[in-house]
C-alpha cells in the first residue's frame, strides 16, 4: 500500500490468482484487502471476483461430496486425485466422512495414507482405527508426523541414497522411486523389529539382487532378511 498503482496491481494480482484457480487464496486476500483504505472502485472490482471464487469453491465442495458418497466404487486414481484436491482446497470440511471411510472401507494403502494426511493437516484429534497391510492400527492424526517427517523418510532413505551416490549414481532415481513408494504405503507403520542400519543394508541388498544395482552393504542375517522380505511382500 502507498504505491500510486497499488489498486491496479491488487486487481491484477487477484485476477491472476483467480485464473490460476487459487480460489481459496482469492477469498482470503480480498477479505484482508477489504479492511484496507482502498478506492471504492477497487473494492467494487474485487467483490465480484470474490463472489466468483466462492462459487467455484462451492462447486468443488459439492463435487467432492458427491464422489465421497460413492468413494468405495470410485477408481483408485480418482480416489487419489480427489484426496489431493481435498488436501489442497478443503481441509477440515470432510473430517468425519473420511474418518468413517478409512475405518469401514477396504482401501488401497496409498489412499489410507492420504486420508491420514488430510486428517492430520485438518487437526483431527479423535482416534482412528483401521487395518493396513495386515496390521491393526490405532492413531490420533494430530499426533502423527507428516509422511515427509517419518523415520523412514528422514533417516532410511537418505542413508540408502548416500551409499548409492558412491556405488551407483545412475540408479538413484530408481531407488528413490521405490523407497518413496514404500514410505507412502507404510505410513504410519514403523518397522520397529528391524533396526535402522539393518534396514538400510536390507534395502541395498534388495536393490543389488533384484535390480542388478551395484551397492555395497553390511552383511545381513538370514533372520533379518526373512523378516524384511516378509514386510516387502506386503508392500507390492
Predicted ranges, named:
Residues 16, 53, 84-85:
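Residue-level signature for tetratricopeptide repeat
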Amino acid at each position: 500500500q502507498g504505491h500510486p498503482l497499488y489498486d491496479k496491481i491488487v486487481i491484477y494480482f487477484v485476477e491472476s490468482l483467480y485464473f490460476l484457480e487459487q480460489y481459496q487464496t482469492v477469498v482470503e486476500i480480498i477479505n484482508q484487502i477489504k479492511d484496507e483504505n482502498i478506492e471504492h472502485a477497487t473494492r467494487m472490482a474485487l467483490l465480484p471476483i470474490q463472489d466468483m471464487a466462492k462459487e467455484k469453491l462451492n462447486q468443488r465442495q459439492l463435487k467432492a461430496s458427491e464422489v465421497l458418497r460413492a468413494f468405495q466404487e470410485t477408481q483408485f486414481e480418482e480416489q487419489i486425485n480427489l484426496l489431493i484436491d481435498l488436501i489442497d482446497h478443503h481441509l477440515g470440511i470432510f473430517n468425519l466422512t473420511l474418518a468413517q471411510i478409512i475405518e469401514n472401507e477396504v482401501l488401497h494403502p496409498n489412499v489410507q495414507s492420504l486420508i491420514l494426511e488430510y486428517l492430520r493437516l485438518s487437526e483431527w484429534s479423535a482416534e482412528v482405527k483401521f487395518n493396513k497391510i495386515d496390521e491393526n492400527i490405532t492413531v490420533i492424526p494430530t499426533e502423527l508426523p507428516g509422511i515427509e517427517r517419518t523415520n523412514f523418510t528422514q533417516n532410511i532413505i537418505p542413508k540408502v541414497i548416500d551409499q548409492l551416490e558412491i556405488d551407483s549414481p545412475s540408479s538413484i532415481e530408481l531407488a528413490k522411486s521405490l523407497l518413496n513408494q514404500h514410505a507412502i504405503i507404510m505410513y504410519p507403520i514403523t518397522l520397529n523389529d528391524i533396526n535402522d542400519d539393518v534396514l538400510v543394508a536390507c534395502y541395498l541388498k534388495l536393490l543389488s539382487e533384484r535390480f542388478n544395482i551395484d551397492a555395497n552393504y553390511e552383511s545381513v542375517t538370514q533372520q533379518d532378511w526373512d523378516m524384511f522380505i516378509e514386510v516387502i511382500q506386503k508392500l507390492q
